[in-house]
Amino acid sequence: ILLPVGAGPLGIETTRRSPFMDTYFKGWFEEKLVEDEGFFMGQKSNSAYAVVNMSMQFYRTWDKAYPRKVYPFVKGVAAFWEKYLTLEGDRYVIYNDAIHEGTVGTMNPILSLGLVRMVMQTVSDMSIFLGVDDDKREQWAFITNHISGYPLQERNGKTVFRYTEKGTDWWDGNTLGIQHIYPAGQIGLNSDPEMLKIAHNTVDEMQRWLDFNGSNSFFPAAVRIGYDPDSILVHLNAYSRHTYPNGFQLDNPHGIENWSTVPNTINEMLCMGHQDIVRVFPVWPREKDASFHQIRVEGAFLVSGELKNGEVASLAIFSEQGRPLSLLNPWKHKKVRMKVWQSDRLLEEKELEGEIFHMETLPGASYSFIVSN
C-alpha cells in the first residue's frame, strides 16, 4: 500500500492536478517537486505514517477486534516496504524518498527509517496476536534488524541527527528530524545512552516548541528522551497561550493534530508506558505535587498515581487484558508492598524489591503499590 500526501472524504478528489495547483503551485510541476496527477510529492512514507495511530491503539488496548480490522492495511504497508527497500551488504537502504514534501530523490530519510521499523514491529506483533502469517515474521524481523541506522551530522559542535543520509541535511521548520522518536516511538529512556545524547542535542538544536504543525510531536519526543521537565513545562505554557481553548493553534488553518499537544505531553510526563516498561512521573519536576487517574499506556494498563512532597504517595494499575507488566520501581531500590484485587476481593499480597518489577497480570485485576515501612 502506497498513499499520497493527503486523502479526503469519499468523493472529494485530493490528488489530481487542479486549477488551484496550476495557479499557485505551477512551478512545483515544472521542477518535478510534485507528481502530475499524483501528489505524493516524492514521499514514500505516508502509508507508514497512517499506521501510527493503528499501532498506538493496538499496543494500548490489546483488543483482538481492532487488529482484525486494521491488520490487512498494516500488512499491505509492510508488503510495500518489503519490495521497495534495497538490501546492500548487511543493511536495507531507502532510495528515492522525500523527507519533506518536494525533497524528491533523497536517500534514507530519518522519518521513513523510524516508521519502517514501527511498521515491521507492529505487523509482526499483530500477526502473533492473531495467529496468522507466521511464515512472514522472519522477514519482518530481518528488516527490523537490518534497516539502515539513523544518519548523523555535526552542528555547532554537537552530534545531531541528519534529516537524510544523502540529500536534505537540515530543515528550519516542522519537526521531521525527531519524529522517529515520536510518534514512531523508536527512541526512549531505555535506549542506548549515546543515542539519547544525540537525541538531546537534536532537540536543543531544533527548538521547535512553537511550530506551525510539528509541536505536537516535538513536545512528546522531548519527554520520551528525558529532556529537562522544567524547560518542557515553560515552553508548553507559552505554547498553550498560542492556542484556542480546544487546542487548535492561533492563525493556523490546518493541523487538528495540535489538539493533542498539551494533554499528550502532560500525560507522557506523568506516566509513560514505552519500550515495555511502565514509568510513573518519569519526566516530571519532583518538587511539583501532581496526581493522575487512569492514564492508558502500552500493555492495556490504566495507571493512577500521586506525587507529594517529592515522593510517590500512591500507585495503582488496572490490567484490562492480563498482559505481562514490567514496572520501574518508583521508590528506586526500596521494598514495595503490592496488593492484587479483583471484583473487590483481595487475591494476593506480597513484597517486591528491585529496580524493575516483572510480573504476570490477570485481566480485570487491580494492582496497588506502596513503599514498605
Regions found by a protein language model. Give the residues of each.
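Acidic/histidine-rich catalytic neighborhood
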Residues: 76-129
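Short alpha-helical basic/polar micro-motif
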Residues: 71-75, 79, 264, 303
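A glycine-rich phosphate-binding loop feature that marks nucleotide/adenosyl-phosphate handling sites
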Residues: 97, 140-145, 281-288
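Active-site core of glycosidic bond-cleaving carbohydrate-active enzymes
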Residues: 2-7, 28-32, 38-60, 68, ...
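Aromatic- and acidic-residue-enriched carbohydrate-binding clefts of CAZyme catalytic domains
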Residues: 3, 9-35, 102-105
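Non-catalytic C-terminal accessory modules of carbohydrate-active enzymes
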Residues: 227-373
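Extracellular structured ligand-interaction cores
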Residues: 47, 91, 178, 300-302
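Primarily short, surface-exposed interaction patches in extracytoplasmic proteins
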Residues: 57-65, 70-76, 83, 94-96
